[in-house]
Design a protein with these regions (language model features):
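Acidic, His- and aromatic-enriched active-site or binding-groove loops in soluble protein domains
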Residues: 74, 135-139, 159-165
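Divalent-metal coordination cores built from histidine and acidic residues
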Residues: 9, 18, 31-113, 125-132, ...
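Distinct, well-ordered alpha-helical segments
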Residues: 58-60, 82-84, 117-125, 144-157
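Histidine-centered catalytic micro-motifs
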Residues: 17-28, 110, 134-141
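Active-site neighborhoods of metal-dependent hydrolases
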Residues: 95, 99-108, 112-115, 167-258
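Acidic-and-aromatic substrate-binding clefts and catalytic sites of carbohydrate-active enzymes
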Residues: 27-30, 48-52, 113-116, 141-146, ...
Length: 258
């Protein structure tokens, strides 16, 4: 019989819902308003790439928009690990707890809060042993969030599945010129089909401005950005960058922002 409602889409383009494989819906790195923003732009399925898991689950009843959402819990000092060299037992505890509470897996935030190379390698293998999805913002205490960090991550994956986050983050000209870095990144991805990735189109770099008790910036990526624009990597540098408009503070709800 006839439909209850007919929507005339003459002249429009219809397509399936978009799958966004890298979003941030938690208060630490994104905003609880993220689900609504995604839905308004045609996204129906997404992968949150850091959590915090409990924060997103708590806010979903109020801020959710009916999206299919998978969440990776962040595996990172000084938050879910106390140091940058956690034991394997600590890794197993975090991974198992995250999976039991609803996470799809874990993500290493190496570019921001690096672990040692050895620990990073062990964490990836441990996550896979526990049948957890594992992603990595490339970077360790030996190599940062750049092309060298990406090369290191590909080598550490050693043929095993790994989601290497936002590939263009490693092609900003820190080691070679941007075109050569992008060419190398594409060659690495083509040569290593076990690695899957994505890229973003925003000209801005979203990161945290928080400082530790010593006044030093906590995120290595934020430090890189401050240094690039000639600011010190501390609370004073953040203030000056904000005053000069080199850094913008984007707020979600109270106590939420990046």
């Amino acid at each position: 019989g006839p439909a209850r409602e007919v929507i005339d889409v003459s002249g429009w383009v219809l397509q399936p819902g978009i799958i966004d494989s890298h979003v941030h819906l938690g208060s630490m790195w994104g905003s609880p308003y993220g689900p609504r923003m995604l839905a308004m732009n045609g996204v129906t399925t997404c992968l949150d790439m850091a959590g915090p898991l409990d924060d997103i689950l708590e806010k979903t009843p109020q801020y959710g928009a009916g999206l299919n959402t998978a969440i990776l819990q962040f595996a990172s000092p000084p938050f879910t690990f106390k140091t940058n060299a956690p034991s394997k037992a600590e890794m197993v505890e975090l991974i198992d707890k995250s999976l039991a509470e609803g996470a799809l897996g874990v993500k290493l935030l190496g570019g921001h809060y690096p672990l040692t190379p050895e620990v990073s390698s062990t964490l990836i293998k441990t996550a896979l042993e526990r049948r957890a999805y594992v992603a990595w913002h490339a970077g360790t205490s030996a190599h940062g969030s750049n092309l060298e960090g990406m090369i290191e991550a590909v080598q550490m994956a050693d043929g095993y599945p790994l989601h290497l986050a936002h590939i263009n983050a490693y092609c900003r000209g820190a080691i070679k010129n941007e075109i050569d870095e992008a060419r190398t990144a594409v060659e690495l991805l083509n040569a290593n089909p076990n690695i899957f990735s994505e890229s973003y189109i925003s000209p801005k770099n979203g990161t945290r401005l928080t400082c530790g008790p010593d006044g030093k910036i906590q995120s290595q990526v934020t430090g890189n950005c401050l240094r690039h624009f000639g600011f010190t990597e501390d609370r004073d540098g953040v203030r000056k960058a904000l005053d000069m408009g080199a850094v913008y503070r984007a707020m979600g709800i109270k106590k939420a922002g990046r």
